[in-house]
Amino acid sequence: MLNKLSSLLKDAGISLTDHQKNQLIAYVNMLHKWNKAYNLTSVRDPNEMLVRHILDSIVVAPYLQGERFIDVGTGPGLPGIPLSIVRPEAHFTLLDSLGKRVRFLRQVQHELKLDNITPVQSRVEVFPAEPPFDGVISRAFASLDDMLNWCHHLPGPSGRYYALKGQLPEDEIASLPKEFQVESVVKLHVPGLEGERHLVVIKPNRI
């Protein structure tokens, strides 16, 4: 699996240490193992997880501004766990409402010795952001409108919303609440993944 991961990283132009690669592989192995009992992801094949979960998460790392992030609706830690491995200087709060997912995240934190994540079981709309976050990240979480409605209290004054999407959601972008604007749209290159991937970066309008 290490050779497969190294090849994917090379194709994506991403440079990681051997320790980071081993952490990512350990996470995939845990996800594969726990998935049998906990049904954490529909992806069953570990090699497919490397593409659809690991690479699909870490390609957004260069676009994240700040040091404190919250991954809302993280599920089994996507994209938060892979991002925490490739951005060890940043801190990631991993938020999910299901206890079984958070139990898995805590086990990952323990086994991989990740001191820059905080798994939390909570609904996003009632979670207090103290202090506010630099970035709110979502992957397959909700529409842009719902994301902004549920997460509006989470970022600080200069914070950003980072929404990982497949095809560019032009209808969702067109119907954004007037309090927000799209700062940038990045077309992502994920080696081995068919279909389009986009990162939509949104910021509050300052009147």
Curated annotation (Swiss-Prot):
S-adenosyl-L-methionine binds at G73, L78, V124, E125, R139. The keyword S-adenosyl-L-methionine applies. Gene3D superfamilies: Vaccinia Virus protein VP39. It holds the Pfam family GidB. Keywords: Cytoplasm, Methyltransferase, rRNA processing, S-adenosyl-L-methionine, Transferase. PANTHER family: S-ADENOSYL-L-METHIONINE-DEPENDENT METHYLTRANSFERASES SUPERFAMILY PROTEIN. HAMAP family: 16SrRNA_methyltr_G (MF_00074). This is Ribosomal RNA small subunit methyltransferase G. It comes from Escherichia fergusonii (strain ATCC 35469 / DSM 13698 / CCUG 18766 / IAM 14443 / JCM 21226 / LMG 7866 / NBRC 102419 / NCTC 12128 / CDC 0568-73).
